[in-house]
């Protein structure tokens, strides 16, 4: 076999630009080995280095008195009271999920679970944020089916409930679906494990599954656009085993109950390379690996293959000296591989040995903290033209049926029913029951409120407003349950950052997110960036997905959206009828134009704090924020959840019925209460806009402008899309 020629062309095929390869040559002072080039290519990939976004991410607010660990660790950590901490993060598996939908989605779930339990937390909930292409295309149906089965197959088997998420459709995702997975875990605050290696001479231990050839250069693939050859990249998709993951969780948590661990890191993107480099780099030490000791699933694996493999269900641990036998006994009890594969050194370098040869010897700093950092050219996104007058071709009732049955609003029961949302017995509110999932903290009355949110059509119209709106909708959804929002994890999904227009979207969205987080005291504590989400030059809609976490003192008292008969309905917040970039505009008029609804961050905070106070005071029996589709959609969703009709009140003068019912003005909630007049009076005293909307009861939605629809008709429209699609 001829030896591989190491040159700029090979480096380019690995994802390194010409100037980056020149930088490698300068750092090394020689031509790198194949293994060294592979290590540089994955560590300098967009997926691992954040080289295009890092300077902008640093502008985000990340601290608060309740934040224990912010960005920089495997996941964010926040104080949730009673000596406990919530550990959570969201991460993407976009590119693999188009090539191999089932395994791409499944291993996305597995990877984010490991990010959380590697810090000492028992995972208690999974969520997701999914974006798919045009439903009329056969490929979209194939991807949706595979992704949903993959999420359910992995999460159900590993025993962690999938409790919430969101799903949108748009042609921009035709060749590039987004699969963003979020995991939340709970740990004792004094038992949190970090990834910084320490202790010269300490053993470095490999645990979990054996290493195979799956996933090699997965991080590089996730840092490039798709072309017409996407199907040929199937070997770069990892293969997961949720049963092994379950054993790995239990074995790691058992070891964590001892005092044996110095540092621990999962082998995620870039596998053994990223885990070893990050652990040693964070600790300011060196690391030496002997690949002869790595458990291997396939014969004849090279050092290059072992270092870049992304085989799943693997962890790297630095142990205290003398604890190897005790740790080995734990992992062998759980029928997992355990091997001492290296040691910590004082060299500040990563040294990789295999079959008596040194295959890599690289200074760590250029691989991690001193990796390339770019301030790419960008242009400020143009503000959209004003929408102008909009007429409706349909009366409100017919428009409601069309909207509530459209792919973006149709019932997700077909999806939810494939997920086990109650395994573990702590889920108090599932999808469709409340604006956020509610998961009880074991051994406590307290509970977590969890949600994922983003409105991509706002983000493409105005990335700054869209980025901010994703944050505030997350905050509203948590607030509507009565919980206090604490912190955010994000997943920034964009196109090619080398294009100034796309880079401008990234900059503007991050700016908007930061403004909203500061206004709401809602810091970002972890996250992920997924760029190059383009297929043959066409980018996805900018999609800065937000995962929100809050806490409520009594989870059983969390407010849902289901109406009971005999309640007054009150609208909290101002309505002017903003239809720009709305779902009504897209689905009814087939238009995607106009500015998204304006944001008033002070009003968001004021209105939300008022709603939360009233929930705590027992004045609100059900609550729903107003978002996609506007007010009439929110009311219909509440009616369906409680199987109770509504007699709607007259609308205010001076606003068109379709604008009132379907405008997507922000900072609004529908509150159901036993005494509407009293709630409106409380709002007036607090300077909060509020108006009566009607009263619950019966089995129809009735009101002005000819609205008279039975709940059965609304339900049939709402449930038809997925049932028909997958019949």
Swiss-Prot record:
Biological process, per Gene Ontology:
'de novo' IMP biosynthetic process
What superkingdom heads the lineage?
Bacteria
Q: Is the Cell inner membrane keyword given for this protein?
A: no
Q: EC no.?
A: 6.3.5.3
In its UniProt entry, the species of origin is given as Acidiphilium cryptum (strain JF-5)
Q: What name does the UniProt record give this protein?
A: Phosphoribosylformylglycinamidine synthase subunit PurL
Q: Does the keyword Ligase apply?
A: yes
Annotated Mg(2+) 1 binding sites: 91, 528
Gene Ontology CC annotation, any one: cytoplasm
